[in-house]
Amino acid sequence: MELQFLGTGAGQPAKHRNVSSLVLKLLDEINEVWMFDCGEGTQRQILETTIKPRKIKKIFITHLHGDHIFGLPGFLSSRAFQASEEQTDLEIYGPVGIKSYVTNSIRISGSKLPYQIHYHEFDDTSMGKILETDKFIVYAERLAHTIFCMGYRVVQKDLEGTLDAEALRAVGVPFGPLFGKVKNGQDIELEDGTKIFAKDFISEPRKGKIITIIGDTRKTSASVRLAKDADVLVHESTYGKGDERMARNHGHSTNMQAAQIARDAGAKRLLLNHVSARFLGRDCRQMEKDAATIFENVKVVRDLEEVII
């Protein structure tokens, strides 16, 4: 499970940062990639990665400001250029209006998509659990931006315990159907009468990962709820220390406020994203240093950076 940041800038493209988009790679888990936001130039950024567009099965949009959606029609059109046997349907989750935006863009431009898009639109009345699969649950809450904006909490369901094959062989269980029974939690009895209890050879279930992705927002308690005990919190950091008034006026957060959210939520790691173009290398290091006075495990991410979860 990995995050890769396709665009980490705020507002408009800059030489060193593209606008918002990131992907959650779930290739080992479910052989899918999930995208969060798709700002202008996202498809160009994908060319610099190993990401295959056909693997992107779900797109989650935080809000309808241009720096988060202007790359979507282009990406969807380019995704249509794959070989026919590679075409797969796509699901888009986002605020009310995302379907109209995409369908009108495709219609007006005369584009043809040889795959189906299934839309899931949300407003204040439909927050909470928005998706559940065999292995993941996704929750959403409204944040505090200048327009309706959502934050997402991706929860991996607990993983099954692993079978201690060596220990099983050591007590005389031959590899084959009996192994499968024990792995499935069934107790067995060997030919000599020895009873084998599955619980003695299967480890405890492992807790799944929690990834929280916060869209544009002022500091809000909704972010704390979404980030509760998260393994990774991706939080916007448009502004730096001392810019709290400006951040509030424009519906954004500072690095210090993001650190406070991570601390209050009990998150394990904080990745600062959506950084203003005025912050260059030295400034970003200072942003990290300042935020670390509140929450130690913090990093300002860069375009194309990959983070293993």
Swiss-Prot record:
Zn(2+) 1 binds at residues 63, 65, 145, 216. It catalyses: Endonucleolytic cleavage of RNA, removing extra 3' nucleotides from tRNA precursor, generating 3' termini of tRNAs. A 3'-hydroxy group is left at the tRNA terminus and a 5'-phosphoryl group is left at the trailer molecule. The active site is at 67 (proton acceptor). Its cofactor is Zn(2+). InterPro entries: Metallo-B-lactamas, RibonucZ/Hydroxyglut_hydro, RNase_Z/BN. Keywords: Endonuclease, Hydrolase, Metal-binding, Nuclease, tRNA processing, Zinc. The keyword S-adenosyl-L-methionine does not apply. It is an enzyme of class 3 (hydrolase). SUPFAM superfamilies: Metallo-hydrolase/oxidoreductase (SSF56281). The keyword Cytoplasm does not apply. One of its GO terms (molecular function) is 3'-tRNA processing endoribonuclease activity. Zn(2+) 2 binds at residues 67-68, 216, 274. Binds 2 Zn(2+) ions. Zinc phosphodiesterase, which displays some tRNA 3'-processing endonuclease activity. Probably involved in tRNA maturation, by removing a 3'-trailer from precursor tRNA. Belongs to the RNase Z family. Homodimer. This is Ribonuclease Z. It comes from Streptococcus equi subsp. equi (strain 4047). The gene is rnz.
